[in-house]
């Protein structure tokens, strides 16, 4: 079948379709599988979503897990309650992940993680790594909050907060706050570093500028 266009599709259970597929709205209560590319305005899947190709959408909400073989571009919200496995890059207005996400790179305005991310990098204006979450990769953001007990490989940001008992290998920031019990191996700051007396920072060095230029409005 060639390029199939669907106005609205509602499935209570599971469905498998051949792509490339274009649709306005797809809602599947169980699992949804497309052999090929999918372009859709609204995609809602209660269980498992699998796209063997590229995914382009206005909004994606998945209660369970999503797997794509290639890249994902979402204009507004990309929200996953369980796990997301993206074969290429993920670009979205807002990314919210409750469980785990794996992708090459993530580009968004807002990135909120409540679990684990295995990625090369995240670039977002606003980044929130929730309590006890883990990021295996680099985080670039205008404002970055590493929540209590979270673990992150590296952060480069304008305004960075490392909350209580969080661990970050390397931080570069214009302004940074490191709370009680937090651990940072290497800290580089341009303007200001507030380090709690009970935080563990192996080395803190004032530098002239960040190693990467971030596009942010002045704080």
Name every feature range the model reports, one short phrase each.
Residues 1-219:
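Intrinsically disordered, low-complexity terminal regions
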């Amino acid at each position: 079948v060639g390029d199939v266009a669907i106005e609205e599709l509602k499935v209570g259970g599971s469905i498998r379709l051949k792509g490339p597929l274009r649709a306005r709205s797809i809602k599947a209560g169980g699992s949804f599988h497309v052999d090929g590319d999918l372009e859709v305005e609204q995609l809602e899947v209660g269980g498992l979503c699998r796209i063997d190709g590229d995914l382009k959408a206005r909004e994606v909400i998945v209660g369970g897990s999503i797997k794509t073989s290639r890249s994902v571009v979402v204009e507004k919200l990309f929200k996953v309650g369980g796990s997301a496995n993206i074969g290429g890059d993920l670009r979205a207005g807002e990314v919210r992940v409750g469980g785990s996400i794996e992708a090459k790179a993530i580009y968004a305005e807002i990135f909120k993680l409540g679990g684990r991310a295995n990625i090369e990098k995240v670039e977002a204006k606003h980044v929130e790594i929730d309590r006890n979450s883990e990021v295996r990769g680099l985080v670039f953001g205008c404002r970055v909050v590493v929540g209590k007990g979270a673990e992150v490989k590296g952060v480069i940001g304008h305004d960075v907060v490392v909350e209580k008992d969080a661990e970050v290998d390397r931080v570069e920031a214009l302004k940074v706050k490191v709370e009680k019990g937090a651990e940072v191996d290497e800290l580089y700051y341009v303007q200001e570093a507030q380090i709690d007396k009970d935080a563990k920072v192996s080395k803190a060095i004032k530098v002239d500028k960040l190693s990467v230029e971030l596009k942010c409005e002045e704080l």
